Structure formats: C-alpha cells, structure tokens
A protein has these predicted regions:
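N-terminal entrance/gating region of PLP-dependent enzymes' catalytic architecture
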Residues: 1-78
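Hydrophobic alpha-helical scaffolding
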Residues: 7-11, 67-70, 97, 119-123, ...
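Flexible, glycine/charged-enriched surface loops at secondary-structure junctions
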Residues: 31-34, 94-95, 141-147, 313-318, ...
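Conserved PLP-enzyme active-site core in the AAT-like
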Residues: 102-268, 335-336, 340, 351, ...
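Active-site C-terminal subdomain of aminotransferase-like
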Residues: 230-335, 339-342
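Conserved C-terminal alpha-helix-loop-beta "cap" of PLP-dependent enzymes
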Residues: 312-420
C-alpha cells in the first residue's frame, strides 16, 4: 500500500480554474469561416436541438433490457426512424450505428452470403469510409475490389466489366454525392449492379437528400450515411451517428435495434423493440453485427433537427448550399484556381493548383504527369494558399495532393466570407 504523500499542486479556487481553462483553450485555432467538408459539414443548428437534447431524461437515459418501460426514449427513436425512411425513400431504418463509415461497413456485411461475398467499392467514395469497410471485410475474410473512377465519378464501363467477370459480387458501394462532390449516374449504376445480381448500397449526404433523388428512387437496396449534418456540431470529429435504411426484403438483416409501433393491453399506442431475434444478445455469434447500444442521443438530435427544419427548411438550406457553392467556385476561378471536374455537384468541388491555370508559364510542364518537379511546385502553391487563408482566420479546403483542393460551401458561408477568401487566394496566386 502506498503511504507517501502525493506530489500534487495546491488546489485552485473557482476563478483560478476558469483562468487556467481559458489559457489552455486559447491555444486552440478557432476559425471564423470554414470552407472544408469531406465528410463533416458546418451547418446551422437551431437552438431547440441543444435545448431538447440537453434534458437530463435524454442525456442519462439507456434503453434497458425491459425497453418497453422507456416509452419516451422508444418514441424518439421511432420518430427518428420514420424521418430517415422519408428522407431516403426506404422501407425500414434502424436506431442508428456509430457513424457513416461503420454504417457502410455494416451494410456490406448485410449483403454477403455463402455464394456471394465480394464487396465492390467505388474509388470516388470517401477514403475514410473505404478504409473502414476494408477493415470490417478483413476480419470476415470477404474480398474487397476497388472500382476505378473516371473524370471524378465511378467508371461505369469498368464496373460493368468487373461485375460480369466476377459472378460473385455481393454488393457495390457508391457515394452520392461522391467524395469530390460530384453526382453519380444513379439510374445507370442501378441497372449495372442489379443486372449482375449484386446489392446496391448508396452512401448519402442527408442534407443533399432534401433536394436530390432519394436512394429509394434510384433503386438502391440499402441507404447509409453520416447523420452529422442533421444537428451535430463538428466537435473535433464526434460524436456523430450513422443512419441505415433498407428495402423491406433486407429489413431482417439490418443491424442494431429497431423500434416498432404496436398497441398495449389497453389498446393504446405503444412502442417496442422489434425483430430482436436477429440481434447479437440473442443470436450471439450468428448475428451479422455486434452493435447494441448506439448513438441514441445523436439520433435524438437528428430527429429534433429534422422536425424543427421541416422538409421546406431543409430544402432551403440545401438550395443555399448549391447556389453558394457555385458562386464561390466562380470566384475562385477568377482568382486563378481552375475547377478540375465539369460534372454536376452539390456543395463540394475540386480545384487544380494555381500553376495549372490557362496561360501560365508552367502550364505545359504541368501537363507532364511524370514531372515530379511540377507536382512539387503545385503542392507548395496549394499549401501556400491554405496557410494564407488560415492567417486570416479562414479554414480553406482539404488538400488532396499536387495542389488540388477540395472545397465545401454551406448555408453558413456568407457572400462577404466567400469574397474575402477569394481575395486572399487571388493575392497569393499573383505572388506565385
């Protein structure tokens, strides 16, 4: 037993603690303007979301094994599931999983069987999501095949050829919009994937679903995505939530908890955990997933957000994302950053390095893909632009390498912010 005195400093008063915490937090870099997405987006969160989600009944609640005694919690999950089904155009949704990446991996696990086990993933999907799917598949021994991208979207001809040669494809994961912000050809993808007997998994940005075709309209079998845009702050990467929804024929393979509506002994509306026989606490090692407790508080936030915004409010926010992203892209083009892709996009887009602009002295050299010197110059130029933006309190886009930058615009970005960022870019491009 340790009996010596502990080498601890003297206690601090409350005022001193506040000063110390402010000193520590002052070391953080806080950006006033954000133009970066790549999976986590800076959307406005109505005040009612924090107000409801901070109630102690929700913060401390846990769905016990006798879940039906927690009718309030079950109802919030049921309402969340209902809204996710409406948003995705699917028949059933679960109570959520950890995040968008694990939702995609769980969806891939739903599709595998003894005859079909190969998982196909578009290279135009988010690299972090791809890595999580690969990690899950490594544990189960399922083969993973990457589908090449062409001009920023999934190569349809390559996908059709690969699926025809395989014959054992379990599923194909496509992201809409994809990692580069571009819209995929959903109808053509559905025909190719289902024509090969595979399942179609569509990863979605829930904000984009307010204005784009739903996965259900595209004919997808499973819709997944990260619910962060639905009322979750950026918060250094979490906690977020992964939403999952599926067609009725896949419902019994959904992982995690599903809340259903029924009537109690008095004939009144009641909520229960349904289809529990497929879950790990009953099926044990035969279950397709081991998730049980999930992101229920985050799902509550998403439910409150969707209720507060409504269909019209979400469509308005999504419409602003679309319009402002196009304005900012044009301002960056004027400043000297050339868009890399010409396809339709939602609120994210990629620009090439400033040295690739038409009419620059280095244009011909940069066309030579083998020129390491040119690639290094591009990367340095892109880094210089992002550092200049940071010095102005602006978080620029995500560097993709070789001077390419993935930009994001949401309803939070004002015209003044976009003009200011473009002015900084123009100044730096002139100095390169």
């Amino acid at each position: 037993r340790f009996t010596a005195g502990l080498n601890l400093p003297d206690g601090m008063g409350e005022q001193g603690v506040y000063r110390k915490m402010e000193e520590i937090s002052g070391k953080n870099t806080v950006f006033r303007h954000i133009f970066r997405g790549a999976g986590a987006y800076n959307h406005y969160i109505p005040a009612i979301v924090d107000s409801v989600a901070s109630k102690e009944e929700f913060v401390t609640a846990y769905t016990p094994y006798q879940a039906e005694i927690s009718q309030g919690i079950l109802q919030t999950i049921f309402e969340y599931q209902t809204m996710i089904c409406e948003l995705t155009g699917m028949d059933a949704a679960n109570a959520s999983v950890y995040d968008g990446a694990t939702a995609a991996a769980e969806a891939a696990a739903m599709c595998r069987d003894r005859k079909r086990s190969t998982v196909y993933i578009s290279k135009a999907a988010n690299p972090q999501v791809i890595q999580v799917i690969k990690t899950y598949c490594f544990g189960s021994g399922a083969p993973v095949v990457m589908v090449p991208q062409k001009d920023g979207t999934t190569d349809l001809e390559a996908l059709e050829r690969m699926l025809a040669q395989d014959g054992q494809a379990a599923c194909v994961y496509i992201q809409q919009p994809n990692y580069y912000g571009l819209l995929e050809a959903g109808e053509k993808l559905e025909a190719i994937i289902h024509g090969a007997g595979a399942k179609f998994i569509m990863g979605c940005n829930p904000m984009a679903l307010a204005v784009l075709k739903t996965p259900g309209e595209y004919g997808a079998d499973i819709a997944v995505g990260d619910g962060q845009p639905l009322g979750m702050p950026l918060a250094f990467g979490g906690p977020y939530l992964g939403f999952m929804a599926a067609k009725s024929d896949m419902m019994r393979k959904l992982p995690g908890r599903i809340v259903g509506e029924t009537k109690d002994s008095r004939g009144e509306r009641a909520f229960v955990l349904t289809l529990q026989a497929r879950e790990q606490h009953i099926r044990r090692e035969k279950a397709s997933s081991n998730i049980c407790s999930n992101q229920a508080l985050c799902a509550l936030r998403a439910g409150v957000y969707m209720t507060a915004m409504g269909a019209e409010g979400m469509a308005e926010a999504a419409g602003q994302c679309i319009a402002k992203a196009r304005y900012f892209r044009d301002k960056l083009r004027e400043a000297g950053l050339v868009p890399k892709y010409d396809g339709e996009f939602f609120n994210e887009f990629v620009t090439r390095g400033p040295l690739a602009a038409e009419g620059t002295a280095s244009e011909e050299a940069l066309e030579d893909a083998s020129s390491a010197e040119a690639a290094g110059a591009q990367a340095a130029a892109g880094s210089r632009i992002l550092k200049a933006l940071e010095a102005e309190g602006i978080l620029g886009g995500l560097p993709l390498g070789n001077g390419e930058i993935l930009w994001c615009v949401t309803e939070m970005n004002t015209k003044e912010e976009m003009d200011q960022a473009a002015a900084v870019v123009r100044r730096e491009v002139k100095g390169i």
